[in-house]
């Protein structure tokens, strides 16, 4: 398990853009993390005031940060940054609303130099909320 202190050491993101609360499981190429979605999230003020829904792009950002924790917690990548390079095959299947716990899984499927490709899913209560293939670059 990786707690919020270690997550903050790995990622440069801070409130309100830090979207990973805790890592539950981690291996060499796979990670499972959670985001507890609260009504106090700033994006709910405008998306949407009468029917708050977590924006899909922020779900994908949370998945990218999850993969980033895995990559940036490795000794050889300490102090580096992870940059989004693309998204493919993104699908949104279930709305994420206040009170939900987003369970995010990212698995590395390909690496070439400083470029990595990740298959990622986000679930709520065991149901698929979003999925996609994320590409990112590791840099200084």
From Swiss-Prot:
Family: Belongs to the thioester dehydratase family. FabZ subfamily.
Protein's name in the database: 3-hydroxyacyl-[acyl-carrier-protein] dehydratase FabZ
Enzyme Commission number, as recorded: 4.2.1.59
MF-aspect GO terms: (3R)-hydroxyacyl-[acyl-carrier-protein] dehydratase activity
Recorded superkingdom: Bacteria
Localization (cell): Cytoplasm
Catalytic activity annotation: a (3R)-hydroxyacyl-[ACP] = a (2E)-enoyl-[ACP] + H2O
Coiled-coil stretches: none
GO CC list: cytoplasm; membrane
Enzyme class: lyase
């Amino acid at each position: 398990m990786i707690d919020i202190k270690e997550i903050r050491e790995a990622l440069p993101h801070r409130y309100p853009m830090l979207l990973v609360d805790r890592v539950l499981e981690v291996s060499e190429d796979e990670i499972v993390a959670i985001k507890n979605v609260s009504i106090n999230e700033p994006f709910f003020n405008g998306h949407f005031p009468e029917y708050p829904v977590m924006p899909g792009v922020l779900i994908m950002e949370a998945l990218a940060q999850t993969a980033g924790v895995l990559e940036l917690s490795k000794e050889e990548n300490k102090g580096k940054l992870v940059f989004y390079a693309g998204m493919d095959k993104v699908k949104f299947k279930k709305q994420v609303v206040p009170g939900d716990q987003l369970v995010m899984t990212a698995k590395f499927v390909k690496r070439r130099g400083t470029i990595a490709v990740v298959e990622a899913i986000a679930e709520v209560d065991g149901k698929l909320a979003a999925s996609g293939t994320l590409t990112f670059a590791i840099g200084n």
